[in-house]
Amino acid sequence: MDTSMPNQPKFLPRIEHNSSGATANSYVATASGNPFETDEEDEIFSRHKMVLRVPSNCTGDLMHLAVSRNWLVCLLGTPERTTLLRFFLPRAIPPGEAVLEKYLSGSGYKITRMFLDPTGHHIIIALVPKSATAGVSPDFLYIHCLESPQAQQLKVRRIEKFKDHEITAVAFNPYHGNESSTGPILLGTSRGLIFETELNPAADGHVQRKQLYDLGLGRPKYPITGLKLLRVPNSSRYIIVVTSPECIYTFQETLKAEERSLQAIFAGYVSGVQEPHCEERKTDLTFSQLRFFAPPNSKYPKQWAWLCGEGIRVGELSIEANSAATLIGNTLINLDFEKTMHLSYGERRLNTPKAFVLTEYHAVLLYADHVRAICLLNQEQVYQEAFDEARVGKPLSIERDELTGSIYVYTVKTVFNLRVTREERNVWRIYLDKGQYELATAHAAEDPEHLQLVLCQRADAAFADGSYQVAADYYAETDKSFEEVCLKFMVLPDKRPIINYVKKRLSRVTTKPMETDELDEDKMNIIKALVIWLIDLYLIQINMPDKDEEWRSSWQTEYDEFMMEAHVLSCTRQNRETVRQLIAEHADPRNMAQFAIAIGDYDEVVAQQLKAECYAEALQTLINQRNPELFYKYAPELITRLPKPTVDALMAQGSRLEVEKLVPTLIIMENREQREQTQRYLEFAIYKLNTTNDAIHNFLLHLYAEHEPKLLMKYLEIQGRDESLVHYDIYYAHKVCTDLDVKEARVFLECMLRKWISAVDLALTFDMKLAKETASRPSDSKIRRKLWLRIAYHDIKGTNDVKKALNLLKECDLLRIEDLLPFFADFEKIDNFKEAICDALRDYNQRIQELQREMAETTEQTDRVTAELQQLRQHSLTVESQDTCEICEMMLLVKPFFIFICGHKFHSDCLEKHVVPLLTKEQCRRLGTLKQQLEAEVQTQAQPQSGALSKQQAMELQRKRAALKTEIEDILAADCLFCGLLISTIDQPFVDDWEQVNVEWE
């Protein structure tokens, strides 16, 4: 046998040595049966030798190794000495060291197993007698690890409570354990017993021991090979998984939040209320191994695996709080143990794994002379590498750090780090080959090339199965030739798949970014072609003969939604003629109108609808659009067909329509209904929209005069009698009313035109009451008297009706009996007028007496005012020398001053300074003018030639100057500043001239 190559297992393919590798133990993984890796890719698994800084005084072979949270603990042994070393892998610091020889050699013990808790601070070492004659019973050591800036401290203690029990498995408690205490943990023994205990450095000699369950049922040899404590996320349900060589058990129970002990989990099973879930597998192995995989930094495992006599069983863990099953899945990786039954012990040893670890997609198995990795998904071997025992030593076991995911393989001489590089790289291909397309798509999502392969194969499979709609969806996501895919679907009678495929391709094009103008032009051409084709496909389905209304309605709805998409609208607007021609070829007037609406061509829509005599649809189209010009254009025709709905629509538009543009289109009125609706809109425009346009008012006035005289009078009254405020042409209105003989309105208008005589004369022809009201309207009493005389003449002349004359005297106080007498025929007796004449005389007498009384009161008031003025001339106020100005508070007598009757005193300049801002603009201008004139007079008198003035001229100048000063004082001192001016301005606005303020701000 070639000594350069270690023995190769019989049922595994030989892996050729790669002589060009960087190390002596480097092998090519691609030749091991992984068809997906290329030589250019990094290997999924690669072995690298680790260099541990072992102290020089520590020698011997590596016996056991455990790793957790980057803490690596190993045992080195020689016949004379056994040493425990504890390394912190991220930093090159001296390891912690503990010599265990005093616990071993002198007592006849040997170490069988070593367990490390998840924190890396608690170590359990199982001890058994070296031989049956050693005279000792199984035991275990507990080592607590502490760190300080200077060194690590490893405290070793023998746990006497567990004598006679060989510890074969430990379930640490990650939920209650910490660096200072393990919390409640479970210990499994070689006889199938499960104990609960809690270890910490402070409990010297006081370790509690509780037996929770017996799987061995008294058998002397029933080792527990695996023990794991789990808690379902977001719940208080605990799960315990236990394995023996041929069975795997699960226990579960919900604990109280404050409960620490794990005894309650087994209580129901001990009492017989329930049985543990057990799965038994036939085996010829004397051991089994339980492993879990959790992603780095995860608290709950994702997968489990059990190495047993059948092979490796793999599955997932349930995370449902109420799930009865815990271990889900029953995938078996067959290791062909049965084929090794006829082999020799040495050959069987080479083909039986010593240990394994679990990654997310692989199981990594350690054999006596090699390590290999098997994919969990397809059970293909993806990696194998042999050990040169002469060089690196005999392989012992393999471990995985649950925190970091790092894998460590160790022999008696060396520790290797088995690196895992992108182990998921080929998962997509495996799922694809198995037809699990959802999973294949998910794992290929990050690689566009792989994703395209998955989608293409998935689409082909769906098409082959007749799932054409599904196939269309996936083809649309691929880069497969558009023409090729379309040819596949065009032969199908159902056009739904090809329509959806083209729509999805259109969606991809419209969302795909373009970088250059040239590409933009190409993109627009592609979009145009796809949109036009889709429109054609839709119209074919909509207008398919021999199809029911439900079919057409369904396709029509989908077509309408498609046409309203933003990119479709944009494309059809740019190519409106092409689309219009296509729709015309399908002879589809409804969709032609819908298309015109979609692109905003409402003019064409309304024209087509009117042409087809679809007046209601045309009106609705007008209502739905926003262009007022179309109302002006089509309202005349619509109001002849649909008067009321058209006016309702016009009124609903409100101020959006210009009444001045609209009304001229409504002049043609062929029947009463049209006239009434036109009148209704004019009333709306005037009373609701408050239009002031003369033409609108004149139009409505003409309609009223011709058809509704009563409404005309109401309109005129609303407009009022102030000719400057009315919005109609008074002269036009007068002419219309004259032509149409609307007398009452004509009287109203003649009053506004101040044609009082003609108004009264006209009113006398049909309404005496109106004539009297008209005669009473002028403000000039002379005109009123004249008008009442005309009424009297009309009422009395020729009738000699004294009673009417007397009534007129009562109605108008401007008329006297002597004014009416000429209207009567000659008479000799005045008996009929006696009472009226006497009343007139009494009235004259009363008025004379009132005038005399008023004259007496006026004389009396004049005398009283004269007396008061005389008293004021003699009134005086005393000014003290210490009096001060009310404004500046300085001595009053130092400057000219004013003193008011209220007692307030002001310097003249102080008063002027505060009064001027309160004056009106006119007063300010007048004050400035007076001051300039006064200054000019003073300068004139001061000139040298003024000495030559005569005495009369000098007196004239002095008088003029005094008059100016008096007028200035009348402005400034007209009222006390405090008692008059400031009080009178309290309700005045701060700003008088807002227009000026706005100009200044601009």
Swiss-Prot record:
Concerning Pfam families, the annotation shows: Pep3_Vps18
Q: How does it sit in the membrane?
A: Peripheral membrane protein
Keyword annotations for this protein, in alphabetical order, are: Autophagy, Coiled coil, Cytoplasmic vesicle, Endosome, Lysosome, Membrane, Metal-binding, Phosphoprotein, Protein transport, Transport, Zinc, Zinc-finger
Entry's Gene Ontology molecular function annotations: protein-macromolecule adaptor activity; ubiquitin protein ligase activity; zinc ion binding
**GO-annotated biological processes:** autophagosome maturation; border follicle cell migration; cell division; cellular response to starvation; compound eye pigmentation; determination of adult lifespan; early endosome to late endosome transport; endocytic recycling
Q: Which gene encodes it?
A: dor
Q: Name the chain's protein.
A: Vacuolar protein sorting-associated protein 18 homolog
Native source organism of the sequence:
Drosophila melanogaster
User: What residue spans do the CHCR repeats cover?
Assistant: 650-804
What family is reported? Answer: Belongs to the VPS18 family.
Q: Which GO terms describe its cellular component?
A: autophagosome membrane; CORVET complex; early endosome; endosome; HOPS complex; late endosome membrane; lysosomal membrane; lysosome
